[in-house]
Amino acid sequence: LLMHVAFNGEIILSAPSWVSYEPQAIIGRNKVHWIQTSRENNWFPSAKQLEKKIKSIKKKNLIFILNSPNNPSGTVCKNLKELALVAKKYNLLILSDEIYTDLTFCNKYDSISKFYPDGTIISGGLSKWCGAGGWRVGFFAVPDKLSSFLESIKTLASESYSTVNSPTQYAAVEAYEGDHAEYKAKTTNILRS
């Protein structure tokens, strides 16, 4: 939600997508533009669809929210490089919601930031892969080029909440620094079932 308030532009979303993206954008006074997807492209827009949508929008301060692995479909975006090329061409900002990165059916994951590092903001957290829903431990990884955007988010955040409680912070350190190969293997096995 803070990202939407800090961003003064319009949002491109693919359908289907997480149910709260649109309401959060509306609260942040961001107009939403939808791209309808299909099973043929794994429930993600094609590069052609993204380019067509960008061209159809008059305002050019845009952000595309990419959620891969996707909620609700669980699929992984397979055309990241092509989407990144379009994004670069139009200087499109991408918010890559990677909250499900460690919970994939195929156990393989790439981030669009690999192909478009200067224009991609990555968001992630513990709630999904670590079973820590409600802890509200998350992060934004922002490229240096977008440091002013990060400052806006930090300013808003400091007025919205002060910090995550100490026990949760210690648990987060263990979650991110510990070796969880066995846990992830068991989780992947459950997903395959």
Specify the residue positions occupied by each region the protein language model found.
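Short beta->alpha connector loops at strand-helix junctions that form conserved
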Residues: 15, 34-39
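A short helix->loop->beta-strand "cap" motif at the edges of active sites that frequently abuts
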Residues: 30, 90-92, 118
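Hydrophobic/aromatic ligand-binding patch that stacks against planar heteroaromatic rings
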Residues: 23-24, 86, 112
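Short, intrinsically disordered, charge-balanced linker/junction segments flanking boundaries
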Residues: 2, 73, 156, 187-193
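Phosphate-binding glycine-rich loop
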Residues: 1-10
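Active-site phosphate-binding strand-loop segment of PLP-dependent enzymes
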Residues: 37-107
